[in-house]
């Protein structure tokens, strides 16, 4: 299970270790078109800027609670965390998976926010067309993090899909 850059990491793991992965769930995943970092965090010391950037991730900006904004603010201002995140993002840009996906036979659920502005819906459609054993599910009124914005619906889709394929 992976969201955003985590989805890309999960896809890479499934590519290199298919025998270890019975099923894969991706949401808002990078791997085709890289905008997961947006325009970055040029004003990372500016709390109001970080709050605004955090709110952009969600369809409903109120989901970006103070706790979430504080966590993002701390992460982008922690030099080690920021460098690791940037390294992962740069790796994602270098490892476009469009040519790999048609050969990946792992059963995959693609759960996507219908209003995702970070990895837009057309990316989900392309993942679905390239992954031969994939199912695409939409969550309406939802941005880039459906498991946070609509956790009950996300879990309902996920567990139903897992049950359907005995995963």
Residue ranges and their predicted role:
Residues 1-33:
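Conserved hydrolase catalytic core segment
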Residues 11-15, 125, 155, 159:
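Short, hydrophobic alpha-helix immediately C-terminal to the catalytic nucleophile
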Residues 30-37, 61:
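A short beta-to-alpha transition loop/helix N-cap that caps and shapes the active-site region
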Residues 44-106:
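Conserved alpha/beta-hydrolase catalytic His-Asp/Glu region
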Residues 80, 119-122, 149:
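Residue-level signal for the nucleotide or nucleotide-sugar donor/cofactor binding architecture
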Residues 104, 110-112, 116:
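Short beta-strand/loop motif that positions the catalytic acidic residue
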Residues 134-167:
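Catalytic active-site module of serine/aspartate enzymes centered on a nucleophile-bearing elbow/loop
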């Amino acid at each position: 299970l992976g969201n955003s850059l985590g989805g890309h990491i999960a896809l890479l793991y499934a590519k290199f270790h298919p025998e270890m992965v019975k099923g894969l769930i991706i949401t808002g995943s990078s791997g085709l078109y890289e905008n997961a970092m947006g325009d970055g965090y040029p004003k990372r010391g500016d709390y109001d800027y970080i709050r605004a950037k955090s709110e952009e991730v969600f369809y409903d900006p109120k989901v970006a609670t103070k706790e979430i904004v504080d966590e993002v603010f701390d992460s982008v201002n922690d030099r080690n965390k920021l460098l690791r995140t940037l390294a992962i993002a740069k790796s994602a840009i270098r490892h476009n998976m469009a040519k790999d996906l048609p050969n990946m036979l792992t059963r995959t659920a693609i759960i996507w926010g219908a209003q995702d502005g970070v990895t837009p819906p057309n990316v989900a459609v392309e993942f679905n067309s390239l992954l031969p054993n994939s199912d695409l599910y939409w969550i309406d009124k939802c941005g880039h993090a459906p498991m946070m914005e609509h956790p009950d619906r996300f879990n309902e889709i996920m567990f139903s899909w897992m049950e359907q394929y005995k995963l």
